[in-house]
Amino acid sequence: MSLLITSLAWGALLDPEVSSASKVALLDAVLEASTLLLRQNGSVRKFLALVAVLCLAEKTGSDNLPALILGSISTAASLSLHLETALRKSCVSNDQAVQTKRAMWILYCIDKSYALRWQTFSLVGDGSLPTTNPPDTALPSEVATTLSLEWLRIRSQYSKICSNILQLGVGAEGEPSENRSNRAVVLSAALEEWYGSVEISQMMLSLEHSDAVHMKLQTSYHYYEARFQLLSISLPDPRSSSPTGSQECREVLRRSIREVITGSNTITSEYLLQDCNHLFIQTLALSMLALDILLESDQGCGKENRALLSIVAGFFARVDIILPQSSIFEEVSNLIEILTYR
């Protein structure tokens, strides 16, 4: 039942003809079903259903996401799904075994992204996975396409970078700054290589224009979120003097902020409703911009920063029209006024 409700909610989310009230009602139904699902005894069917709900929760920014991650991990651990033999024993068919392996990788990816975003401990390690890489075989019994399998492989590569960034952040305090900087440079290069990879380019070329734009936005917000985290680790305490290296980091940070904010005009209202991560990365960029303006106390809000703040105001004005019940536009407007006229 939970899979059926989740499928209906996904369909409603992707269909612009469905009313907002219907979408909210279906998402509420998914939340209620997931609460009941978490109370059930552990089984492969429960695990697959939890991961399906987890994917939807990540897109919609559900407050239930941490509970779903923990519930999925607990279910997988109780069935020893990280072990090939135990996984196959728990599954009723080869097709279900492949789906379960794939679901383990999806859980891994979502866990890493969540941990990176909120700077918490990741709960799914590489040793928790039954295979070295995600299964890349589409099954006759499912609708999954080659592109969706390719995207899982691409995201799994990104998640491994996230894992390394998390490890760098955890060890940052007691580690010599030079060692930390060197590791950050290596990870930054790996992130750039991932973002400009042939696999992503080929996938874009195989998509229709609207789908390619959507996929480009999706890879972009993953890329910039990891980039912001890396730069935050690399930058010294704002109260300390800024050596040449940190000044270079600040320039990269400003360029990243500019790229994210100026790219907001390519995010359609439809995309905003389908994926709340677009809203998060714009909010993160605004926060970074605000901090940069406040740290440059002697220069005030320059011409370029005022232009960026105007773009931000336009973006969140659109959000206010799409989500009239939200107070975010008023809050952003107050912040922009403070930054502009302080």
UniProtKB/Swiss-Prot annotation:
The keyword Signal applies. It comes from the Eukaryota. Disulfide bonds: none annotated. Pathway: Mycotoxin biosynthesis. Keywords: Signal, Virulence. Induction: Expression is up-regulated more than 10 fold in toxin producing cultures. Residues 1-20 form the signal peptide. Gene clusters encoding host-selective toxins (HSTs) are localized on conditionally dispensable chromosomes (CDCs), also called supernumerary chromosomes, where they are present in multiple copies. The CDCs are not essential for saprophytic growth but controls host-selective pathogenicity. Part of the gene clusters that mediate the biosynthesis of AM-toxins, host-selective toxins (HSTs) causing Alternaria blotch on apple, a worldwide distributed disease. AM-toxins are cyclic depsipeptides containing the 3 residues 2-hydroxy-isovaleric acid (2-HIV), dehydroalanine, L-alanine which are common for all 3 AM-toxins I to III. The fourth precursor is L-alpha-amino-methoxyphenyl-valeric acid (L-Amv) for AM-toxin I, L-alpha-amino-phenyl-valeric acid (L-Apv) for AM-toxin II, and L-alpha-amino-hydroxyphenyl-valeric acid (L-Ahv) for AM-toxin III. This is AM-toxin biosynthesis protein 12. It comes from Alternaria alternata (Alternaria rot fungus). The gene is AMT12.
